[in-house]
């Protein structure tokens, strides 16, 4: 019992990405700017979708949930990195580490399923446009988004509970910038082989199957696009599909490489580098790739900026008019 209490009460140490060198300071500032950009972009995306009825479609409904996941994802990791870097302390409590594991697995799993749902939405919209209003009704998109969250939470709860029950009786130093399961398993003095097999099974369900579904959907979309008579429409569709596949590959590729390798094949440098892609870079790129290049989103953004500008202008003129009335 004493050993078990020691396991649950001791803090972990996050070795992180940064040292005290000038290069690390620059790298830290770059990542912090990326974090601010990610939160700002995704928050703006949610506000735009919620505020204008033109964006109340299944595609943008799913995109709003993707933006919410991305905000939570970067906010789960980067603030702790910033705090540790500025304070010089690298500790994280057992409960804090458990929460990071739970939230990151929830969001990573949920986003994998949500990206697959979004590819299905695009497949139906482009390949079966006449059936789109029937197949993609409001409840269908709500079911896709809700299912992604719920399945992500369930998977995360199981893995978090299982991973944290291992005894950590050696070093408490996690050679990573956040509490990630593969990095934590290296600290366990118990045999984690069976659990690693479970991680591989989950990786097949949450990574390989959705990625295969996305690839198949975009493959069918490309075949449909090739049959279009308009060269401009073909060019636009190919451009959109290629950007989407780049982001999907940037997200799934490092994620698959991290979670489908045995513990013995993991190196701290590789794991940290790969994790930057699916925890920080992809959430920043998603709004640009999926939304800000879209004419509808740009039109709504322009209208919002115009209305805010006119509102400020009117607020300035009202006091002037009142003053003139008093003078008269």
Swiss-Prot record:
Cytoplasmic side: 50-57, 121-139, 220-236, 293-328
Localization (cell): Cell membrane
Molecular function per GO: G protein-coupled receptor activity; olfactory receptor activity
GO cellular component, one term: plasma membrane
Record carries keyword Transmembrane helix: yes
Domain of life: Eukaryota
GO biological process: detection of chemical stimulus involved in sensory perception of smell
PROSITE patterns listed in its UniProt record: G_PROTEIN_RECEP_F1_1, G_PROTEIN_RECEP_F1_2
Residues annotated as glycosylated: 5
Extracellular side of membrane: 1-25, 80-100, 159-195, 260-272
Disulfide bonds: 97-189
Membrane-spanning segments: 26-49, 58-79, 101-120, 140-158, 196-219, 237-259, 273-292
Predominant place of localization: membrane
Membrane topology qualifier: Multi-pass membrane protein
Presence of the UniProt keyword Cell membrane in the record: yes
CDD domains per the UniProt record, alphabetical: 7tmA_OR2T-like
Keyword vocabulary terms for this entry: Cell membrane, Disulfide bond, G-protein coupled receptor, Glycoprotein, Membrane, Olfaction, Receptor, Sensory transduction, Transducer, Transmembrane, Transmembrane helix
Family: Belongs to the G-protein coupled receptor 1 family.
Chain's role: Odorant receptor.
PANTHER family: OLFACTORY RECEPTOR
Name of the protein in its database record: Olfactory receptor 2AJ1
């Amino acid at each position: 019992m004493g050993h078990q209490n020691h396991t649950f009460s001791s803090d972990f140490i996050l070795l992180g990405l940064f040292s005290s060198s000038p290069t690390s300071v620059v790298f830290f500032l770059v990542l912090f700017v990326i974090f601010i950009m990610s939160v700002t972009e995704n928050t703006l995306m949610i506000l735009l979708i919620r505020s204008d009825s033109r964006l109340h479609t299944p595609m943008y409904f799913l995109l709003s949930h993707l933006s919410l996941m991305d905000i939570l994802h970067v906010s789960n990791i980067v603030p702790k990195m910033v705090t540790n870097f500025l304070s010089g302390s690298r500790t994280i409590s057992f409960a804090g580490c458990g929460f990071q594991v739970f939230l990151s697995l929830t969001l990573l799993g949920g986003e994998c399923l949500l990206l697959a749902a979004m590819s299905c939405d695009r497949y139906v919209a482009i390949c079966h446009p006449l059936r789109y209003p029937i197949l993609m009704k409001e409840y269908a998109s709500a079911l896709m988004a809700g299912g992604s969250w719920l399945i992500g939470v369930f998977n995360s709860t199981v893995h978090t509970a299982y991973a944290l029950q291992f005894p950590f009786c050696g070093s408490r130093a996690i050679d990573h910038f956040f509490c990630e399961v593969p990095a934590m398993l290296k600290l366990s003095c118990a045999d984690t082989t069976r659990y690693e097999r479970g991680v591989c099974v989950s990786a097949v369900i949450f990574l390989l199957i959705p990625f295969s579904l996305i690839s198949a959907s975009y493959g069918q979309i490309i075949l449909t696009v090739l049959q279009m008579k308009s060269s401009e429409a073909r060019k636009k569709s190919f451009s959109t599909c290629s950007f989407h596949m780049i982001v999907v590959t940037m997200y799934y590729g490092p994620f698959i490489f991290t979670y489908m390798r045995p513990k013995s094949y993991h190196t701290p440098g590789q794991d940290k580098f790969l994790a930057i892609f699916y925890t920080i870079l992809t959430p920043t790129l998603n709004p640009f790739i999926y939304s800000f290049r879209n004419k509808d989103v740009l039109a709504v953004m322009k209208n919002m900026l115009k209305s805010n500008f006119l509102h400020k202008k009117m607020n300035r003129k009202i006091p002037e008019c009142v003053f003139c009335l008093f003078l008269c």
